[in-house]
Amino acid sequence: MIVTLKDGSKKEYAEAKSVIDIAYDISEGLARAACAGEVNGEVVDLRTVIDSDCELNILTAKDEKGLAVLRHTASHVLAQAVQTLFPDAKVAIGPSIDTGFYYDFDCPPFSRDDLDAIEKEMKKIIKKGAKIERFTKSREDAIAYFQEKNEPYKVELIEDLPEGSEISFYSQGDWTDLCAGPHLMSVKGVKAFKLLSSSSAYWRGSEKNAMLTRIYGTAYASKDELKEHLEQMEEAKRRDHNKLGREMKIFTTVDVIGQGLPLIMPNGVIMMQELQRWIEDEEAKRGYIRTKTPLMAKSDLYKISGHWDHYKEGMFVLGDEETDKEVFALRPMTCPFQYYVYKAEQHSYRDLPLRYGETSTLFRNEDSGEMHGLTRVRQFTISEGHLIVRPDQMVKEFKDCIALAQYCLQVLGVEEDVTYHLSKWDPNNKEKYIGDAEVWNQTEAHIRQMLEELNIPFTEDVGEAAFYGPKVDINAKNVYGKEDTMITIQWDALLAEQFDMYYIDENGEKQRPYIIHRTSMGCYERTLAWLIEKYAGMFPTWLCPEQVRVIPISEKFHDYAAKVEAQLKENGIRCSVDQRSEKMGYKIREARLARVPYMLIVGAKEEEEGKVSVRSRYLGDEGMKDLDEFLTSIKEEIKNKTIRKIEVQEENK
């Protein structure tokens, strides 16, 4: 057999070989570092035997997929340690994730002392160095095995698998888990790890299920890499919008209001209004027409669109179909409403494209276990829009939507922080979608070609499309590495028929338009969270809730400070005066901690000369300036939405 390696070189063998044997044949160093193999694109155990021609990549912890295998094994060591120390704990699931791993247990919550004890037990298990072995059982035997061990969550997972399935297990010493793998050869491969936290999580993410206790951890190939990661985690905690956004009085949450329903505080409202005005102005420049549509509709509307069949579980339904004459639902999106704006009058081919935009409030019934700060909420605001176009206009208009999204990202200073994804349908799960394979394949091909023509790197994600069409998702990671979708642009060749939308062509015949579903900037709440974490609260001046703080050096200069404040406000600058009887150093520090970009210090000399002493987060002490000079510069900075570089590091503390 011939094994083709990642670098294109080939190895020829007369008999079957395991992945680890081939790794040793390449180099002993590679074999010692190996975590798994990738055979024809599938990640497998190192013990997997290869008996035919294939492509092989030996994965180490330097590879994302190899590191995931190491972390998956670490999660099994964690579960073994927990059940050693807490024998009554029931195990649920324990996958690797982007930043490490977790394992869910049915048991009381863990304290930090508990986590420290579990870490010690994990080190004992690793020191013993048990080999990891894979074996299989029939579905019936697997169920019986876990029933005997009183592990109900494992039983439920197996019962969800088809009858006749072969069920794989992994054992390390005297501890065994249900698992598809792959795993390391031995627990000794888990050399550097840390348990980070414990929290609650619903079984399978649904609040209808049992509340479990989750332990998060991370693992790396070396202690140096682990140390670097833990330092990054400390910085992430400092930037976490869920903490910083509350400290900056941008938003808060209240138990009696409910999860996923944040209160946007005055500072947050200022920022959202700035973003909204800017987005609406940019859309107006590009020919968008504003609409304002209802927050809810009868179920009839969603039955026409297909949302009732494909998305009902994600909607807030008001009423009972069996007992009520009319059932309503809060809208999860704006599209079917804007279709009726279009249908309210007849349109010629000359009228198209029509670009409808709306700053919409939407509602989605997310599981409470998914709620997090401003990134995952049940009510949110979005810059939504729908373009009704002729088929021959589709490519240009779609590219223009991408260009608008890229412009918005560039202005916000986050264009380098995103990834692009072509979200496709899953042809093996056709019941999730409307339309036939030909339409789906054609539209996906169009989007693929556009992204290539625009030189945009992208990945293709099967099964991530909306039920009515493929889309471009522009994603970003939060400070903890979790990826969220920020902006979506969708190609829809199907819903116009569902709603009997048409235009009159040059021959007087009715024709179906195409539809582009898009956002310019996406969800405002999620964007706020993104910006808080990106800038650690030190936003570009145009977005700052407070742009200038006037600080008189003593009470006798309060009147002059008030005059300066009045002039600033007349020029549209958001400002305040600190009239407290505190030391100047304290006032300056307080303004800095409040992340105010500019402080204007006023005293005898400033009042006498009609000037202000400028202190900025960017350059520190900028000296004394005429107020008009300062006004000109800050107004220009705000108008241009300039992102100034912070030159003085102590101002950033």
List where the protein language model places each region:
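NTP/phosphate- and nucleic-acid-binding module
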Residues: M1-K90, I97-K653
